[in-house]
């Protein structure tokens, strides 16, 4: 561990928000992941920008995470700095405009909490996101979606930090949002906050829809187990979960990793899974589905760290 780098990071944020060899299993929804060389929590844009600058000066790799809900991190961990933005980053704002209402939230906000704040303002158009795990920044990064809605349907703009620490404001077109993809991924930007264009609605109807979607998730998804959400992207013309089920892989296990019996599109951690287990299972599922149906499944989960390529 480099004491000079450690001290620089502690000078940027308070000492208690910098740790060394932090187990990333504590910060991912999969409950899997080895240690980060340096783990830093930021609360302000200025802190995040300063950490980026520090990493650039020392040629350190930087990974920014939100709630860690779409990540599989190597058992060997992450070299360099892992930066996590806290929930309250940059707050929550609502302003009226000619087109409707603009709602802005910080990247570190819990996505479901952000959706409920919107519902409490009697604004409609964001109900689909209420049960999606993760942070707002992660949702924008991945163009998250569920039950017929996705981020690109309602986003107006997002502010990002470049790898050089420059702040950019990108409109909907500039974000280049498509299925689980964005310019943010392609350029390696870091989300600061995002603004959405929404409309007034009936609060009772909005809350009822959220409740219905959350119940559907509970009924259909293995929420009782750690996972990274949907493991595979939806192949054109197919559903990944059905292909996996039809291939006879329901309940298929490698070590502590298992294809969920409740929803075959999810790989779950039954208690002691390693990244190696999950990666082997992903390999097996992709191979068998390809052999049986000629369809190549692509991971939706971000595979990060040493020796994590499927």
Swiss-Prot record:
EC number: 1.3.1.98
Protein's UniProt keywords contain Oxidoreductase: yes
Class of enzymatic activity (EC top level): oxidoreductase
One Pfam family linked to the record: MurB_C
GO molecular function terms listed in the Swiss-Prot or TrEMBL record: FAD binding; UDP-N-acetylmuramate dehydrogenase activity
Pathway this chain belongs to: Cell wall biogenesis; peptidoglycan biosynthesis
Needed co-factor(s): FAD
Keywords: Cell cycle, Cell division, Cell shape, Cell wall biogenesis/degradation, Cytoplasm, FAD, Flavoprotein, NADP, Oxidoreductase, Peptidoglycan synthesis
Primary localisation category: cytoplasm
GO biological process: cell division; cell wall organization; peptidoglycan biosynthetic process; regulation of cell shape
InterPro entries: FAD-bd_PCMH, FAD-bd_PCMH-like_sf, FAD-bd_PCMH_sub1, FAD-bd_PCMH_sub2, MurB, MurB_C, MurB_C_sf, Oxid_FAD_bind_N
Presence of keyword ATP-binding: no
Residue intervals of the FAD-binding PCMH-type domain: 31-216
Catalytic activity from the UniProt record: UDP-N-acetyl-alpha-D-muramate + NADP(+) = UDP-N-acetyl-3-O-(1-carboxyvinyl)-alpha-D-glucosamine + NADPH + H(+)
Superkingdom of the organism of origin: Bacteria
Gene3D superfamilies found in the cross-reference section: 3.30.465.10, UDP-N-acetylenolpyruvoylglucosamine reductase, C-terminal domain (3.90.78.10), Uridine Diphospho-n-acetylenolpyruvylglucosamine Reductase, domain 2 (3.30.43.10)
Localization (cell): Cytoplasm
Residue numbers annotated as active site: 180, 230 (proton donor), 300
PROSITE patterns, A to Z: FAD_PCMH (PS51387)
GO cellular component: cytosol
UniProt family annotation: Belongs to the MurB family.
Cited NCBIfam families: murB (TIGR00179), PRK13905.1 (NF010480)
Function per UniProt: Cell wall formation.
Protein name per its UniProtKB record: UDP-N-acetylenolpyruvoylglucosamine reductase
Phylogenetic lineage: Bacteria, Bacillati, Bacillota, Clostridia, Lachnospirales
Name of the coding gene: murB
